[in-house]
């Protein structure tokens, strides 16, 4: 197998037994593909499909004037180039977006044309600016106002029709009341529901309910048509001899005979007996078609049609009328030969529509329309036209109602139609079909839907949400445009003057800036970025509300298998509402989640992959990835464990249709990074998945010794590492960039054969962690496409590395690991294992105030020299300065209002002039509890404001850096072109050339060295083809020079132009501080199995327990943390980690002993190829084997894929190979006494993470600070520099101890006794430590509260 550049330097030994048939797909595909489909930038305007921006514009245009004489049509759109690139946007705090220009056509028709003929009078086309559309970066994020944001996908209920019941909760009888709901993509909801009396009602948009027949009548159906649609009928023949029923024997089954049923003289069924299947067979056998029935049998039956006396035209009985003696007498009197009645029974043919029609008071279509109008617009007087229009617009107008393709597909599929397509609006048949299905379900003939089934929930991704937002903006524009087109002079206007695009821009801006689903990207580490982009949320607009979501919605559903991770979800109020996509999951064209399966044909597993959605999956038998398969791909077992219709079951192998593609198919990316996940309890695995996302990138990254094989994939797809775009040779490397000369076969004509990768150095992330990239390649290295060239934060040689491998012992140690506390060795701190760098951004803004402009300056009143020593002449701190709490970063003075001056100040003013006291110091200082090093300063100046010296220096340095970059780029490109030219001319026959080259001479290396490379292009050969190629090269070089000059000019313009600052801001200075945080007691650490704890103590190395060979352990964990938590994975990880380290040390000893290369090769083969996946060690050269062995000295990295990992036997074999005890336990000695501990201790290497819950960020101290305005009590919380609350229960504690003076101090001078605390401060300054407590402000507040109730209460002073 082929290894990538970094892979072969450190191959990870995998214990996986099964080959993955399918590569893990690109992890950010959901986001990237969705937005690509929205913009369709890669397609020509004519070829664009009906989705995204194009669909939104098409749905709103053409816009017609009210008269229809002027039409504004949409032609096409294009996106311009963004003004700034991603990095510039982040620095300047702007949005990374491109201008949208829409080509529209204004068509004016002739008003005076004859009726019916349309004569075009004028056509104008114009491109209109429609605001900025934010662009997605390569990694699936958006830069909005300078910060990276992610639009989280939403899991919402799919449009379509849903049938449900109330679970017996509505009525006290507990009767199930069924309902149907038609949910469109946009438009009014239509609900049908039963009440406890079995009448059917309709609601529109959840308003007041009306009988369902009102809606049918409004659709134009009369009573007879309604009855005919919903009921079968029985036919009765009436004559003077009696009544005969046209018999359909099947309809009698189960009824109790109300009269004797006879065949000739024989009684088949006696009166009051039940009619059974045997009786029906007898009747069918005798071919009985007509049955004599007594007239009592007819009474109570319901007429299915209007009965009219043909001779007189008189209406005898109405449709849906019950037949009584009176009605029967009238029928006989009029000699009606036959009637039809409704066929109903209590079992499966309920009379629901008939009952509903009785409570319906409307008679005609107009009555029904008016009734609906009254319900929708209560209080407005209805007119015929208004009622008609309102009803039309509700469900039948494409502008107001859209089921969407998904909705129509779900609708048709649910109603059993074969064609998944159809109109976006409702039709009469649709409404009738829904009612019929609802009645069928009430009759017991159908089932209700499960709304938590993933076939009924779909994913709405970025592209779709932005499209909806864009459409909303366009609809607002449409209203304004219609108004304008109706103005008298509209036909003389240009499209630009008619369309005001502000609403569109505003709605897009609002969505990206403040939507619930537009979130500040979680940028702690690469995993948290990837997970954030793969998140699906059920919350947000059009989704669920957190408070109203019940248990069912949050629960794991069988259809989540392979689509949504059952493990990774937040703890707390959002549990189950926010989920993560499974590793292989993707969305289909309709937005439903699909997961891949291998096709199984006649018990044989093929490599054919098919993606199935939850709807399609139900009908198949699907085997697990762990099903045993022989070498020919046949399933071995006769009975295979599989899934079918939401159940786990056993099926014979011939019945199996599909098989899972991978054992990690059911989990998300974060969960798939937990080794031995199969041995952890789900609750702890959930914590493990969530805590990996909080790991802070360490200063020195270290790959996990025990991983799962997913680490490389996550690091690659996260975008934090630099990946080669094209293969080639590394030409130049330094800390900030890598230059690759591209292979000839990968270069395209006109594209430079050089790739330059600028690395990100010490940049701040959203979470204040440090983003830094380090090159992995050396000049001369040959790299292929997609190889990792540089590591980013938390990556080590292209693998995700969130923490550090520590030598752990599971044992108690003096109670310091009580309750999950963690004891660590001082060695961990010394070696900077968990040292992290955090970058803080501090901003100072100079505004224009009413009293005059604020000024950034080093001339600050009443500040000593020492405080200004780190500032330059512009008043801004130097880069590299080490600052501590209280130091000035940026000096700033603000004009002070004219106050009443004291005589002394007047004197000073008279002597020293104005400046002394009319400004106050408002400098930016380092906040308390923070110290660090200034690593960067940026100055932003408003257009028209003079730039200070520092701003100019920064600008010049930036321009110089860009110039150097571009010149290097040009030099490398030229060198590349010259080398290609040299290869073309060497050894060829010359025609003419510089430097006295004779015609017919062969061109040699000496000749080429004697002239400048630029002159090589002047050589003319006798081979005309080569001459043309050389001319092309000369042309390309000229073109590149021109382009680079243009780019330099463009960059210079951007750097020197004024900045677009907020209104009233003259200048803004940003200072970046790098803060180094070592690990210390109070910091939170965790493993990957949900085993978290807080550091209780750091112990000197000499006091730590040590092993027989003198190695002290790094960290001591409490063994009681394992059994009750049921996360045994951590113990297995510890064993395997020890083995991995042991094998690495063994390789190290071999290298030290200068072992032969064959020896090393055979040992590596033993390590890699005895169990698990086979590695191709033989394909590596000797040098590569030595480099690999060198990289393995500190441990052989191992992978145990989830649900397919190392067995106990595998671990023991590895421990044996490393010459370590198979028990995984060792005898330890107490570092303080040297005594042996009583029992052997489990020792090994565990991967530990430092989480972003650092004690430095949580703890602070206050002496005096801000107070609340009303109560005058100190504020609370670190952000407000608040105090500690001494609450009710704490007061009880002091009361219990009788500590009266302490209590008095707490409640007065330390809290809200305003005079007392001022006096106390003064006393302490004077060295007098007495206190006088006065009355706390709380009493005054209480008095005021009581007075507000109208009770006058006064305190009497003694």
Curated annotation (Swiss-Prot):
Source organism superkingdom: Bacteria
SS bond list: none
GO CC terms: DNA-directed RNA polymerase complex
A single BP term in Gene Ontology: DNA-templated transcription
Cross-referenced InterPro entries: DNA-dir_RNA_pol_bsu_ext_1_sf, DNA-dir_RNA_pol_bsu_external_1, DNA-dir_RNA_pol_su2, DNA-dir_RNAP_su2_dom, DNA-dir_RNAP_su2_hyb_sf, RNA_pol_bsu_bac, RNA_pol_bsu_CS, RNA_pol_bsu_protrusion
Any one GO MF annotation of this record: DNA-directed RNA polymerase activity
EC annotation from Swiss-Prot or TrEMBL: 2.7.7.6
Keyword Transmembrane helix: no
Catalytic activities: RNA(n) + a ribonucleoside 5'-triphosphate = RNA(n+1) + diphosphate
Keywords, alphabetical: DNA-directed RNA polymerase, Nucleotidyltransferase, Transcription, Transferase
Assembly and oligomerization: The RNAP catalytic core consists of 2 alpha, 1 beta, 1 beta' and 1 omega subunit. When a sigma factor is associated with the core the holoenzyme is formed, which can initiate transcription.
Similarity field: Belongs to the RNA polymerase beta chain family.
Role description: DNA-dependent RNA polymerase catalyzes the transcription of DNA into RNA using the four ribonucleoside triphosphates as substrates.
Record-given protein name: DNA-directed RNA polymerase subunit beta
Annotated organism of origin: Methylococcus capsulatus (strain ATCC 33009 / NCIMB 11132 / Bath)
């Amino acid at each position: 197998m082929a290894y990538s550049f970094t892979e072969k330097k450190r191959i990870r030994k995998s214990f996986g037994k099964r080959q993955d048939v399918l590569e893990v797909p690109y992890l950010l595909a959901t986001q990237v593909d969705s937005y690509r489909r929205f913009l369709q930038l890669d397609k020509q305007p004519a070829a664009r499909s009906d989705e995204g921006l194009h669909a939104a514009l098409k749905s709103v245009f053409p816009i017609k004037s009210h008269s229809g004489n002027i039409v504004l049509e949409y032609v096409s759109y294009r996106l311009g180039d963004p003004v700034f690139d991603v990095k510039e946007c982040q620095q300047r705090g702007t949005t990374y977006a491109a201008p949208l220009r829409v080509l529209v056509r204004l068509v004016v028709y002739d008003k005076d044309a004859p009726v019916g003929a349309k004569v075009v009078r004028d056509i104008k086309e114009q491109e209109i600016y429609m605001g900025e559309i934010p662009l997605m970066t390569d990694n699936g994020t958006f830069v909005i106002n300078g910060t990276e944001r992610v639009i989280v996908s939403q899991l919402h209920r799919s449009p379509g029709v849903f049938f449900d019941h109330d679970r017996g909760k509505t009525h006290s009888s507990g009767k199930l009341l069924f309902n149907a709901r038609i949910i469109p993509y946009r438009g009014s909801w239509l609900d049908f529901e039963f009440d406890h009396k079995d009448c059917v009602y309709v609601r529109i948009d959840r308003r007041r309910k009306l009988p369902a027949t009102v809606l049918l009548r409004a659709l134009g159906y009369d009573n007879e048509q309604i009855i005919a649609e919903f009921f079968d009928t029985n036919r009765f023949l009436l004559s003077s001899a009696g009544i005969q029923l046209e018999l359909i024997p099947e309809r009698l089954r189960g009824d109790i005979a109300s009269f004797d049923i006879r065949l000739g003289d024989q009684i088949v069924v006696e009166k009051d007996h039940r009619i059974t299947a045997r009786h029906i067979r007898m009747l069918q056998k005798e071919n009985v078609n007509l049955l004599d029935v007594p007239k009592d049998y007819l009474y109570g039956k319901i007429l299915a049609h209007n009965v009219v006396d043909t001779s007189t035209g008189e209406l005898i009985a109405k449709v849906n009328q019950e037949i009584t003696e009176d009605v029967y007498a009238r029928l006989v009197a009029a000699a009606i030969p036959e009637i039809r009645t409704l066929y109903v029974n209590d079992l499966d043919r309920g009379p629901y529509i008939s009952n509903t029609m009785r409570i319906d008071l409307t008679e005609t279509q107009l009555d029904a329309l008016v009734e609906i109008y009254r319900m929708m617009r209560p209080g407005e007087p209805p007119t015929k036209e208004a009622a008609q229009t309102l009803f039309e617009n509700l469900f039948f107008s494409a502008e107001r109602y859209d089921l969407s393709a998904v909705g129509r597909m779900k609708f048709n599929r649910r109603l059993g139609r074969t064609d998944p397509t159809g109109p976006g609006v409702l039709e009469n048949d649709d409404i009738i079909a829904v009612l019929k299905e609802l009645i069928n379900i009430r009759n017991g003939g159908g089932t209700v839907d499960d709304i938590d089934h993933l076939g009924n929930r779909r994913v709405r991704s970025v592209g779709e949400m932005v499209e909806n937002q864009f459409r909303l903006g366009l609809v607002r524009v449409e209203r304004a445009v219609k108004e304008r087109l109706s103005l008298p002079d509209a036909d003389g206007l240009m499209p630009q003057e008619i369309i005001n695009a502000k609403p569109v821009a505003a709605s897009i801006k609002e969505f990206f800036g403040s939507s619930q689903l537009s979130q500040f990207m979680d940028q702690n580490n690469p995993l948290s970025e990837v997970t954030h982009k793969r998140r699906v949320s059920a919350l947000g607009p059009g989704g669920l509300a957190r408070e109203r979501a019940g248990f069912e919605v949050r629960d794991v559903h069988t259809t989540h298998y392979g689509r949504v991770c059952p493990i990774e979800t937040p703890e707390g109020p959002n549990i189950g509402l926010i989920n993560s996509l499974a590793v292989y999951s993707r969305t289909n064209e309709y937005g439903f989640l699909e997961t891949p399966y291998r096709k199984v044909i006649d018990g044989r597993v093929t490599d054919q992959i098919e993606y199935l959605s939850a709807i399609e999956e139900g009908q198949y038998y699907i085997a697990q990835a762990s099903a045993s398969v022989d070498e020919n791909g046949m399933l071995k077992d006769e009975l295979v464990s599989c899934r079918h219709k939401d159940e786990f079951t056993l099926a014979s192998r011939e019945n199996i249709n599909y098989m899972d593609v991978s054992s990690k198919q059911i989990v998300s990316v974060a969960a798939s990074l937990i080794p031995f996940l199969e041995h952890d309890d789900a609750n702890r695995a959930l914590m493990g998945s969530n805590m990996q996302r909080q790991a802070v990138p360490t200063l020195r990254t270290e790959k996990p010794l025990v991983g799962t094989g997913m680490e490389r994939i996550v690091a690659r797809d996260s975008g934090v590492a630099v990946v080669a775009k094209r293969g080639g040779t590394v030409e130049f490397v330094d800390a900030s960039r890598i230059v690759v000369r591209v292979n000839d076969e990968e270069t395209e004509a006109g594209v430079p054969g050089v790739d330059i990768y600028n690395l990100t150095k010490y940049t701040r992330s959203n979470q204040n962690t440090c983003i830094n990239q380090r090159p992995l390649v050396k000049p001369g290295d040959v790299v292929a496409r997609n190889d990792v060239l540089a590591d980013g934060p938390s990556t080590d040689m292209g693998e995700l590395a969130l923490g550090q491998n520590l030598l752990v012992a599971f044992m108690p140690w003096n109670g310091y690991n009580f309750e999950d506390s963690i004891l660590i060795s001082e060695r961990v701190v010394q070696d900077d294992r968990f040292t992290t760098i955090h970058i803080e951004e501090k901003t100072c803004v100079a505004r224009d105030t009413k009293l005059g402009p604020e000024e950034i300056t080093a001339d600050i009143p009443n500040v000593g020299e020492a405080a200004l020593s780190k500032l330059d002449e512009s008043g801004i701190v130097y880069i590299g300065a080490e600052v501590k709490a209280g130091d000035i970063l940026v000096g700033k003075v603000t004009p002070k209002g004219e106050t009443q001056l004291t005589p002394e100040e007047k004197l000073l003013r008279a002597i020293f002039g104005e400046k002394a006291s009319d400004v106050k110091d408002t400098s930016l200082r380092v906040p308390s509890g923070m110290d660090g090093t200034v690593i960067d300063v940026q100055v932003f100046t408003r257009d028209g404001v003079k730039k200070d010296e520092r701003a100019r220096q920064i600008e010049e340095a930036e321009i110089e850096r860009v110039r150097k970059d571009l010149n290097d780029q040009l030099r490398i490109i030229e060198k590349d072109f010259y080398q290609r030219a040299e290869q073309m001319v060497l050894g060829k026959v010359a025609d003419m050339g510089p430097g006295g080259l004779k015609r017919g001479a062969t061109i040699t290396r000496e000749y080429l060295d004697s002239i400048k490379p630029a002159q090589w292009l002047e050589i003319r050969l006798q081979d005309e083809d080569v001459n043309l190629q050389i001319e092309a090269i000369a042309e390309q070089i000229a073109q590149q020079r021109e382009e680079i000059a243009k780019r330099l000019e463009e960059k210079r313009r951007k750097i020197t132009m004024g900045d677009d600052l907020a209104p009233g801001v003259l200048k803004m200075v940003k200072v970046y501080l790098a803060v180094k945080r070592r690990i210390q007691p109070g910091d939170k650490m965790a493993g990957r199995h949900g085993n978290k704890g807080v550091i209780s103590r750091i112990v000197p190395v000499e006091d730590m327990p040590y092993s027989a060979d003198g190695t002290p352990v790094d960290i001591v964990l409490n063994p009681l943390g394992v059994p009750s938590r049921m996360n045994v994975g951590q113990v297995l990880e510890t064993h395997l980690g020890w083995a991995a380290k042991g094998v690495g040390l063994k390789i190290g000893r071999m290298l030290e002993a200068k072992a032969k290369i064959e020896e090393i090769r055979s040992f590596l083969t033993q390590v890699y190829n005895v169990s698990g996946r086979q590695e191709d060690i033989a394909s590596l050269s000797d040098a590569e084997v030595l480099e690999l062995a060198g990289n393995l000295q500190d441990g052989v990295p191992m992978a145990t894929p989830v649900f397919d990992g190392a067995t106990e036997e595998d671990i023991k074999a590895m421990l044996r190979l490393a010459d370590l005890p198979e028990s995984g336990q060792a005898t330890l000695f107490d570092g303080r006494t040297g005594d042996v501990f009583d029992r052997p201790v489990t020792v090994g290497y565990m991967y530990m993470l430092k989480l972003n819950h650092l004690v430095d960020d949580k703890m602070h101290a206050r002496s005096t600070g801000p107070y609340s305005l009303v109560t005058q009590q100190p504020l609370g919380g670190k952000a407000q520099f608040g105090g500690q609350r001494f609450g009710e229960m704490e007061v009880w504690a002091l009361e219990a101890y009788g500590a009266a003076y302490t209590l008095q101090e707490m409640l007065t001078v330390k809290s809200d006794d305003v005079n007392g605390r001022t006096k106390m401060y003064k006393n302490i300054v004077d060295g007098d430590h007495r206190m006088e407590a006065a009355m706390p402000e709380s009493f005054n507040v209480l008095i005021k509260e009581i007075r507000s109730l109208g009770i006058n209460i006064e305190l009497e002073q003694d």
